[in-house]
Amino acid sequence: MLDINSLPPWPLVGLAFGVAFLYSSVGFGGGSGYLAVMSLFAISTQLIASTALSLNILAASIAFFIYWQSGHFTPALLWPFLLTSLPAAFLGGYIHLHDTLYLGILYAALAYVGIQLLFWNQSAHPASAPRRFAWPAILVGGLLIGLLSGFVGLGGGIFLSPLIVLNGWGTPKQAAASSAGFIVINSISGLLGRVMGGNFAFGLLSATLLPVGLAGALIGSWLGAHYLSGTLLRRILGIILLLTVLSSLIEFFRV
C-alpha cells in the first residue's frame, strides 16, 4: 500500500497527466479516469476518492471557464440539478463505505461511463426547440448523480451531459458548460462531506498530482477547443476505461 505522504510512482504521474489532457479536451473533469488509474495502484480507497475529487475541481474549473468565456453557459441548465445533487453529494461523501462495496460501485460506475463515452453520439441531439424541463426527472437525476459522486469521487458531468442533450433541454456545448460547472460544485460538496465524515485523505501523493493534473487540463482544453476531434477522443477514452475496469476486476478476483 502506497503511503499517503510518499511521492507517486512515475507511471501514475504520467497516467494522471494523460487523463487530465484527454478528458479536458472533450469538456470533462476526468474523475472517472483518475479513479480508474489510481485503482491500478496500491492506494487506499479514501485517498483515491479524495484525490480524484480534488483533481476534478481543478480540471473542470478550467473547462468551465473556457465554455463560459465562449458564451455557451446557460445558468438554467445548471442550478435545477444542484437543488438535489449538492446535499446528496455531501451525504455520499459523509458516508463511509466498506472497501469491497466501494470498489463494486466504482467498477459499475466506470463501466457505465466507458460505455457512454464509447457509444454516445453527442451530435445526435433533437433539432427542435428546447423542451420544457421535466422537474421530477431533474430532481431525481440530480439526487442519484450527487449520491454517486459523493460515494466514489466522481464529479457527475458524464451522467449530466447525456441527460441534458437527449431530453432536448440544451445543445451539446451548453450541456458541456453546465456539466463542467456541475462537476466543480458537486466535487466541492463531496469533498466537504468527506472532511466532515472523516473520510478525507490528502498528503504528498495527492499534492504532487495536482499540478500534474492542472498542466494536463490546460493543454488539453486549449487543444480540444481548437484542433482535436472530440468524438474520436471520447471513443478512445471509453475503450481505455473499459479495459481498465476489466484489468482491475481480474486483479480483484485473483486476490
Which residue stretches match the model-derived regions?
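Juxtamembrane transmembrane-helix boundary motif
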Residues: 1-24, 33-41, 45, 65-148, ...
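Helix-loop boundary and gating motifs at the non-cytosolic
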Residues: 31-32, 157
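Membrane-interface alpha-helices at helix entry/exit sites of multi-pass transporters
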Residues: 43-54, 76-77, 169-180
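Transmembrane alpha-helices of multi-pass small-molecule transport proteins
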Residues: 51-66
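Short hydrophobic/aromatic, small-residue-rich stretches within specific transmembrane helices
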Residues: 52-56, 179-183, 206-210
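Structural signal for alpha-helical transmembrane segments and their flanking helix-loop junctions
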Residues: 139-193
